[in-house]
């Protein structure tokens, strides 16, 4: 007696479905922890012009790239600037608060490679990934103003899906969480590697949902007293960028925030607010 055709089909489909379920679970876990380093956005600073192959600018640029690549990436943030126009070069990077050492190094390398490919021979450009941003500019050491917040390069991203239930309450509670994290990021007791962290993460129960969030400022350039001002400014843009969205962020070069309905950071130090 032979098994029926339908039975054979079920026997064939069962291991296949089990494999698919396993893969989906794996993908979900990777996504929730954000283990990938997804490209987000870039901006070529075309007003700064282009450099010629073999020029002094290219020599200085490559020297800076190699110097920063040889660092330990322990602080997650660094900048290097030297020279005067037309050969002034500044490179800076900022890694996400949970992406230090090797993770930060690999993101920096991806940023440099991405700028070379997307903004070929541009003297200036910025690229954002999930775990860092990298900027190259021809601004001279004299003109490089570390006491000014840069809002020009801010841009929003959001999840297209909307939350269910009381959207107004969700918006208010999520903004309240971001504001609390902004205060925490600027707390003088919030230190990392001998410097103010200018970074904070946390989570909060909002109705039946749990919101996970983080805020961060560019440690190597933004003065601590400016971080709060920068974060307050972009959090005010929440209604325009993220109204009722299941996740959203505003990215820039001075500060940024992000929130999701799932955990997206590697660190386990998030505290329920």
Swiss-Prot record:
Q: Which domain of life is it from?
A: Eukaryota
PROSITE patterns per UniProt:
GNK2 (PS51473)
Q: Where in the cell is it found?
A: Secreted
**Residues in domain Gnk2-homologous?**
39-141, 151-264
Q: Which UniProt keywords apply?
A: Repeat, Secreted, Signal
User: What span is annotated as the signal peptide, if there is one?
Assistant: 1-32
Give the UniProt entry's GO cellular component terms: extracellular region
Q: Which Gene3D superfamilies match?
A: Gnk2 domain, C-X8-C-X2-C motif (3.30.430.20)
What family, per the record?
Belongs to the cysteine-rich repeat secretory protein family.
Q: Which protein, by its recorded name, is this?
A: Putative cysteine-rich repeat secretory protein 40
Species name: Arabidopsis thaliana (Mouse-ear cress)
From the broadest rank down, the organism's phylogenetic lineage runs: Eukaryota, Viridiplantae, Streptophyta, Embryophyta, Tracheophyta
Q: Which gene encodes it?
A: CRRSP40
């Amino acid at each position: 007696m032979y098994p029926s055709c339908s039975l054979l089909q079920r026997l064939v489909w069962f291991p296949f479905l089990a494999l698919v379920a396993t893969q989906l679970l794996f993908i979900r876990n990777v996504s929730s922890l954000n283990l990938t380093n997804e490209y987000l956005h870039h901006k070529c600073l075309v007003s700064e012009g282009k450099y010629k192959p073999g020029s002094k600018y290219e020599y200085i640029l490559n020297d800076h790239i190699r110097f920063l690549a040889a660092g330990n990436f322990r602080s997650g943030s660094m900048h290097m600037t030297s020279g005067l126009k037309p050969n002034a070069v500044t490179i800076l990077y900022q890694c996400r608060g949970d992406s230090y050492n090797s993770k930060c190094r690999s993101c920096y390398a991806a940023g440099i490679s991405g700028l070379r490919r997307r903004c070929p021979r541009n003297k200036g450009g910025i690229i954002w990934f999930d775990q860092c941003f990298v900027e190259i500019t021809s601004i001279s050491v004299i003109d490089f103003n570390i006491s000014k917040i840069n809002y020009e390069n801010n841009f929003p991203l959001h999840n297209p899906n909307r939350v269910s239930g009381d959207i107004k309450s969700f918006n208010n509670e999520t903004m309240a969480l971001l504001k609390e994290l902004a205060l925490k990021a600027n707390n003088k007791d919030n230190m990392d590697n001998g410097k103010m962290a200018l970074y904070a993460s946390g989570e909060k129960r909002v109705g039946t949902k749990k919101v996970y969030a983080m805020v961060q400022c560019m440690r190597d350039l933004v003065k601590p007293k400016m971080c709060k001002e920068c974060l307050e400014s972009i959090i005010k843009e929440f209604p325009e960028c993220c109204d009722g969205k299941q996740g959203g962020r505003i990215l820039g070069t001075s500060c940024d925030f992000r929130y999701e309905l799932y955990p997206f950071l590697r660190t386990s130090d998030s505290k329920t607010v």
